[in-house]
Swiss-Prot record:
Species in which this protein is naturally found: Clostridioides difficile (strain 630)
Enzyme Commission identifier(s): 4.2.3.3
Function: Catalyzes the formation of methylglyoxal from dihydroxyacetone phosphate.
PANTHER family for this protein: METHYLGLYOXAL SYNTHASE (PTHR30492:SF0)
Keyword Transcription regulation among UniProt keywords: no
Transmembrane segments annotated in the record for this chain: none
Similarity comment: Belongs to the methylglyoxal synthase family.
Name this polypeptide is given: Methylglyoxal synthase
Length: 137
């Protein structure tokens, strides 16, 4: 199971705190992150992050590509709802891909905590079943 971690600039500290708090759970999974977010997490934790490009430089689109190829099973995208983003269309495309491919996406800390606790309890294992069935078709 692979998790994508993305955070807008004003939410990076929150993402780092989240990763520190749930490091024992997150370390069990493959982790992908946009460039700056991934660096910040790696600087503050022992987590191994597959870093992609920075969000505005195509990182969101790279995560979208991983969603299409069923390599991402959960997206935690801590968005800043109070600041306009220059790459808003990329963000909307990423959210749309999560909807199309049935990938759970958390866009705030509350939903991120719900998903990470569900993941720890094995409640997202349906993703693995779904992937194995689609590979047989």
């Amino acid at each position: 199971m692979n998790i994508a971690l993305v955070a807008h600039d004003q939410m990076k500290n929150t993402m780092v705190g989240f990763c520190i708090g749930y490091e024992s759970i997150l370390k069990k999974y493959g982790l992908y992150a946009t460039g700056t977010t991934g660096k910040r997490i790696m600087d503050e934790t022992e987590l191994n992050i597959n870093r992609l490009a920075s969000g505005p430089l195509g990182g969101d689109q790279q995560i979208g590509s991983l969603i299409v190829t069923q390599e991402i099973d959960l997206v935690i995208f801590l968005r800043d709802p109070l600041t306009s983003q220059a790459h808003e269309t990329d963000i909307q495309a990423l959210i749309r891909l999560c909807d199309v491919y049935h990938v759970p996406i958390a866009t705030n800390l509350a939903s991120a905590e719900i998903f990470i606790k569900a993941l720890d309890r094995g409640e997202l294992s349906w993703r693995e079943v779904r992937k194995s069935k689609s590979q047989r078709i």
